[in-house]
Amino acid sequence: MKIIKNILLVISALSLSFGALAVDTSFPNDKVTMWGDFGGITLDVKLIGGAPYDPLYQSMIPIWEERTGGKVKILSKKSHFELDKEIKVDIAAGNISYCVLSNHTSFATQYGDIYRDLNGIIPGDYLAEFVPLVLEHSTVEGRLVQLPQHSDVSNLWYIKSIYEDADNKKRFKAEYGYDLAPPETLDQWKEQAIFWSDPPNFYGTQYVGKEEAITGRFYELVIAEGGALFDDGWHPTFNDEAGQSALQWFVDLYNAKAVPAGVLNYLWDETGLGFATGTVALNLDWGGWGAYFNSADSKISGDVGLIRFPMGSGGKRGGWSGSHTYSILNGCPEENLDAAASLIWILTNHEAQMHEARGGKLPTMTRVWDDIANEMDAEGNAFMSNLFSTFKASMAEDAFTPPLIPEWIPFSNIIYPELQAAILGDKTVKEALDAAAKETDILMQDAGYY
């Protein structure tokens, strides 16, 4: 209960920390602008919501409305998992009349032909500012169906002081036979998490435990262990030795009580908030939490370390990656297209990405990577400089997307309950993965892959 109470204590402070980011309303560094006179136009939109996302809307949408005369009507704002379900209901009901949708490169392919092609709607000079590979991942069957706002990859955060404590070093070496330092491998991560744990007051680590979140975490451990989800012919292979080793890692941590008992209900807010309470030693998470972890509202401010994702036995690091994006839908009236393009411009432009990067989110514009690094160096902000150098290396050397196919989420819906069943002990690791592989084989056959 203590960790839950601590999480609740910091929720109100969270929005303040994420929101304390300045915007230069003159947009001096934007080479391309897309202002217009949109008086009388109201754009219906559905957006991802939550503490890491709302401050951008709160900052940028009022500026857009004041400068253009247009209005934004937010029909829905919720987590991506809940928004995904809502979009599918909308598609089934033929209710896709809104203009702008929060999207994600991992989700976009499953929604079919609901999108406007942004080529020709968004100026080429503006598109040229984005990282080419990110635009490639935003393209489906030759059509640019989404404009990327920020990218994600995870690295391992840790509480520095517990690693610097002389007594901890002595006890750890006596028990495990090697010097205490932030983990370099998945095995060390597991050993250290067990060493640190003192439930229910303190836990060695944690993980997101449901929906596509745990699917993605399992996926990157499979890769780190030298495996793959599918072979070249799209037959499932995740129930092999590498997949079993990956799932056993989650099971062992749960059985050792090295993670909170409620992790199978955790998503991103729970892991981020939990780490900031100072009750978790090691936390695999996105860069976008970085500024909050080190803020005055966090109980670990000034005591936060960061390393790249540890190596698996396959000689690879985890690096499950994707980008948060915005799409314009076919249901958007022709007379509203320029306004819709202008809105997603202000949510993805240089100023918006600098705004987000100051909190730790990873830019999708090439120039912003350099500009944010220069800004942090000039300020002498060693913490944020290290954040961007670490995550830049991960994006360049470790990052990989999930399969960008329409079946990704249906596949996730098959496998994640089986992962949970193994973690809870209701099935063995092999039983769970074999069951998921059998159902996945049917899914892929029905989809026409073989």
Stretches with model-predicted labels:
Residues 22-44, 65-66, 141-143, 194-201, ...:
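Immediate post-signal peptide segment of exported/extracytoplasmic ligand-binding proteins
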Residues 23-37, 101-157, 164, 187-190, ...:
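Hinge/lid segment of periplasmic solute-binding proteins
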Residues 26-36, 51-71, 415, 433:
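Short, polar/charged alpha-helical segment
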Residues 27-37, 287-301, 312-417, 447:
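C-terminal lobe and pocket-closing loops
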Residues 33-37, 119-130, 136, 170-182, ...:
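Short, solvent-exposed loop/beta-turn-alpha elements that line the ligand-binding surface or hinge
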Residues 60-133, 137-147, 166, 171, ...:
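Extracytoplasmic "Venus flytrap"/periplasmic binding protein-like
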Residues 66, 73, 138-214, 224-264, ...:
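Helix-loop-helix "hinge/cap" segment bordering the ligand-binding cleft or interdomain interface
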Residues 100, 108-109, 216-225, 241, ...:
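Extracytoplasmic/periplasmic substrate-binding proteins
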